[in-house]
């Protein structure tokens, strides 16, 4: 998806290895739809992906995955990162958002700010940055301590 963000857990081995780190809801809402590797979080909880803000999580594993109709609050565990659902080169979560049915770019007029981290497109796909409080990290396609961030910190 154009404008999506990818986050990979710290895993010891294997491109599609299981992760013990959970994916959490970025906001309060209702799980409006699930499919193989997919969770849709409807922030206005009306169950309609065409209205209001909706968050897409892609590559969510089937183990302990939130179910359609679940109401969640920000920070609620909703599943585990995986390679399920679509094409994937390794265990990660792909997160994007829609407003009234239209995909909204992460680095656009309304940036996709997560816990103060603001995304910026790179010169090529998958080489963007996140900036918070004057600190910038650059996306990495290999496990790198310098690109490590943790929700809630």
Predicted feature residues:
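Catalytic cores of extracellular degradative/oxidative enzymes
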Residues: 5-12, 64, 70, 76
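Short beta-turn/strand-loop junction motif enriched in small, turn-promoting residues
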Residues: 12, 28-30, 44, 80-84
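Acidic, glycine-rich catalytic/binding loops that coordinate metals and/or anionic ligands
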Residues: 13, 17, 67-73, 96-153
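Short hydrophobic beta/alpha edge segments that flank linear recognition/processing sites
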Residues: 39, 72-87
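Zn2+-dependent peptidoglycan hydrolase active-site motif and core
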Residues: 18-68, 89-97
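Short glycine/threonine/proline-enriched tight-turn/helix- or strand-capping micro-motif at secondary-structure
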Residues: 1-26
């Amino acid at each position: 998806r154009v404008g999506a963000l990818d986050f990979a857990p710290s895993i010891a081995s294997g491109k599609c290895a299981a992760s013990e780190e959970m994916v959490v809801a970025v906001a309060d809402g209702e799980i409006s739809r699930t499919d193989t590797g997919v969770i849709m979080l409807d922030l206005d909880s009306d169950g309609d992906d065409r209205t209001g803000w909706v968050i897409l999580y892609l590559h969510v594993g089937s183990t302990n995955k939130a179910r359609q109709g679940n109401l969640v609050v920000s920070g609620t565990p909703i599943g585990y990162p995986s390679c399920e659902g679509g094409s994937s080169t390794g265990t990660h979560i792909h997160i994007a958002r829609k407003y009234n049915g239209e995909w909204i770019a992460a680095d656009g007029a309304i940036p996709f700010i997560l816990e103060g981290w603001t995304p910026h497109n790179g010169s090529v796909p998958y080489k963007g940055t996140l900036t918070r409080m004057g600190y910038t990290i650059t996306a990495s396609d290999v496990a790198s301590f310098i690109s490590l961030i943790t929700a809630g910190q």
